Structures are given as C-alpha cells and as structure tokens.
C-alpha cells in the first residue's frame, strides 16, 4: 500500500512558475523552506517544478497539469485561473496582495553598446534588430510593452503636464517594426540574445544581471522611466489534497519571510517586504522615474486598454 503523506516518502509540492523564477527557487527558496519544515515537523519536503512563459504556465494548469502552486508574471493570469475555478482562494488577501517579488524592465545590448542605445526610443533606430518575447505566451512581453508605452507617457507628462498618447503609440509602433524574433518566454529570449542574435533585448533586469554574473559580454541600459513587474503567487485550490494543504499554505507564507526575500534579492529580484534588503544588491540600476501597474489603473485596465486596443489592434496588426 502507498505510504500516507508525511511518512518515509515525505511530501511533494508541485510548483509551476514563469521562466525567470528558476534560479532563486531552486538554489535558495526550496532548500530554505525544506530545512525549516524538517526542523519544525520532521518531514521531508520535495519540490517538482516546471518553468515557461506565464501565459503558457497558466494554459498548462487550465489543461490539467497537477500544479499545487503557481508563481506568475502577471496578475491577469491568476485571474484567468480563478475565472475557470482552479483558484478559489483570494490571493489578494495574502501579504502584499499576493506579490512575492518585483524587478524593473531594462534594455540589454552587446558589450560596448555598439548601437548607442540609451533609452527606449533608441530601439526605433532604422535597421536595429530587436529581440522581444511573444506577448501571446509571455507575461514578461506584456510588461515590456507597458514599460515602453508607459515610459513615453510619463516622460511627456513630466515635460508638458499631459501624457502624450500619440507619441507613446508612435514610439511603440516604431520599436515593434524592429522586432525580428519573438521567443515564447523571457528566458528563451535571453538565450536567443546570448547566442549572438540581434542588437538588443527588452527584458527583466534580473536576466541581464544573471548574464553579467556568468561572464557574458552584455551591458544593461536602464531607461529613464520604466515599469517594475510584480509577480503573484496563487494556490491551485482544485489540485491541493487535504493532506498537503498545510505544507502548501506554509510554503506560500514562507515566500514573505526575511530568509526568502533576501534570497530573492541575492538572485536579483527586489524584495517587496523590506526595501533595506535591496541595498544588499549593489548591481541594481538607478531608475529615475519608476512605474507600477497602478499607473495604468491595474491589470483590469492595462490589459484591454494597452495590450489589446493599442498593441494588438494598432501596433502588431500594422507592423
């Protein structure tokens, strides 16, 4: 007969996450939680993980993969899981509205910055080859579009007192004309760039810092104004067995512990609980005008108004 959970075999948590969570989870957060649970409960905890673009992860869960927990790039994906009955608990009632970490959007260029890229509008230079993840499969791609569009809005607002939507649309359109490949996730986009393709990549700052750490000849260009992506955790209630509920809930709460937040900072996410933790990472770039999703009125407005109406209808369809 199979052993009940908690006996010799221990407990297994299945976690699906958007692509850039891999290093921090596997190298620090999982081992930290497993050690804590072992001391407190005498049980072994193992983790089974899968990583892909946030939209892809969400679709996989909707198609029936046995995830207990998901960490997603965008809140809208969590809402999709709730709408289909996979998530019944309210992740916004968790600490920090369910957001476990954040990271700003930047531009990666080749060593020496041969194309002279200093801000988002420079990505519209004629002949430039831009790598950009696919907004259909990647949450990071949607954050990137909001970063570019929002950056132009807030700069024009600072200059004239009014956000210039026409200018923001024009800039986004001109940049998108230079996109020559759209990998399925932020991590696949980084791999494409690492292999020597393209002149620039818009992505999470974390990706650039990991590349630099591994000795790759890359420069990180921090735009004057850019968005911080904020990443929610959700429990896939439909999939969590009663025997696993306690350990799943404990792991979710652990994500806001000092230990986990400092681990995220070590692997180049910003902490959401304590800004002093972020001072430990000397690699973070200075952002003159930081944006959040609140600038757009949250995902409920940002997705239909910017991703659907502006990007899909006015930019992508007219490339």
For each feature predicted by the language model, list its residue ranges.
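Early extracytoplasmic/lumenal segment of secretory-pathway proteins
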Residues: 1-84, 93-94
């Amino acid at each position: 007969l199979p052993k009940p959970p908690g006996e010799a075999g221990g407990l297994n948590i299945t976690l699906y996450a958007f692509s850039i969570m891999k290093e921090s989870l596997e190298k620090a957060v999982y081992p930290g939680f497993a050690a804590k649970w072992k001391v407190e409960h005498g049980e072994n905890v193992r983790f089974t993980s899968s990583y892909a673009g946030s939209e892809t992860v969400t679709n996989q869960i909707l198609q029936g993969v046995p995830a207990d927990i998901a960490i997603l790039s965008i809140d809208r994906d969590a809402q999709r899981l709730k709408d289909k009955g996979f998530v019944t608990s309210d992740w916004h009632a968790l600490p920090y509205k369910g957001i476990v970490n954040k990271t700003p959007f930047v531009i990666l260029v080749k060593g020496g910055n041969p194309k002279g890229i200093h801000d988002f509008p420079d990505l519209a230079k004629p002949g430039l080859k831009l790598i950009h993840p696919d907004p259909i499969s990647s949450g990071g791609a949607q954050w990137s579009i909001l970063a570019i569009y929002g950056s132009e809005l807030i700069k024009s607002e600072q200059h004239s007192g009014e956000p210039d939507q026409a200018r923001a649309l024009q800039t986004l359109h001109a940049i998108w004309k230079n996109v020559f490949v759209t990998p399925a996730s932020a991590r696949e986009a980084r791999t494409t760039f690492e292999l020597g393709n393209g002149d620039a990549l818009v992505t999470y700052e974390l990706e650039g810092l990991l590349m630099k750490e591994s000795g790759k000849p890359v420069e990180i260009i921090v735009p004057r104004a850019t968005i911080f992506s904020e990443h929610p955790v959700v429990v896939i209630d439909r999939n969590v067995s009663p025997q696993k509920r306690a350990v799943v809930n404990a792991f979710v709460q652990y994500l806001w512990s000092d230990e986990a937040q400092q681990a995220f900072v070590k692997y180049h996410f910003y902490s959401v609980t304590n800004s002093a933790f972020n001072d430990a990472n000397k690699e973070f770039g200075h952002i003159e005008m930081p944006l959040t999703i609140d600038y757009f009125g949250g995902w409920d407005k940002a997705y239909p108004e910017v991703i659907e109406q502006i990007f899909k209808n006015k930019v992508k369809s007219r490339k």
